[in-house]
Amino acid sequence: MKFIISRFLTKGVLVLVGMLAGSPLVFGDTIAIIGTGNVGGALGPQFATLGHNIIYGSREPDREDVQALVAQTGHNATAMLPVQAAAAADIVVMATKWAQAEVALKSLGDLAGKIVLDPNNAVHVDSSGKRHHAVATSAGQMIQDWVPNAMVVKAFNTLGAGTMANPESAGGPVTIPIAGNDPDAKAVIASLVTGIGFEVVDMGDISVSQVLEKMLVERGNANITFNYYFRPVPQ
């Protein structure tokens, strides 16, 4: 993590986030977006507006829809094979479907020292359309187990891709809760969250992913579509 932070800092940009005061918070460098569906297609263009280099990882990088996303993203975004994208990046966003996440993640090569942003939810939808948490722990914990030398941060799993792509469409503030074991990695992801227009709250270590993923289950089972907004109680 110190290597990533030092590379960011050489760009001479420092961004402060009140919720995580005292941590090194920065913008810059390369983000690999693994997956070009709704989530990848929402976050990639948003992160590009912050000055990040965006590389989309796709099994078919020359496919028409992938190249259309590259063009939409602008800011010199590119697309290449997932393993190439991950190798070139400091931050890897796992924007695949949950059912594909393990195979996709393990195909990326050595992710030691990289930040892995996990927006996944381990959710099962039954025959009635009701959503259920589908694993004993959480997607976040499982991903951290699969890449033990990477720094996994759970974020962006509690809202829809439409709101990710256009935060102003929410009609008011939206809170993105994050969780992870490495404070510096969480600080970097927090800077992404606030940079694109959301509020951020650090909820704790990666085990808290269980709570965050169940928040999405409850959102999906509600009779209305809503976004989360909350603040820590003043101490």
Regions flagged by a language model, labelled:
Residues 120-153, 158-162, 167:
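Rossmann-fold NAD(P)-binding glycine/threonine-rich loop
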Residues 49-91, 95-103, 107-110:
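Conserved N-terminal Rossmann-fold NAD(P) cofactor-binding segment
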Residues 107-113, 147, 170:
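Short, conserved loop/helix-junction motifs that constitute active-site signature segments
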Residues 11-23:
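Bacterial N-terminal signal peptides
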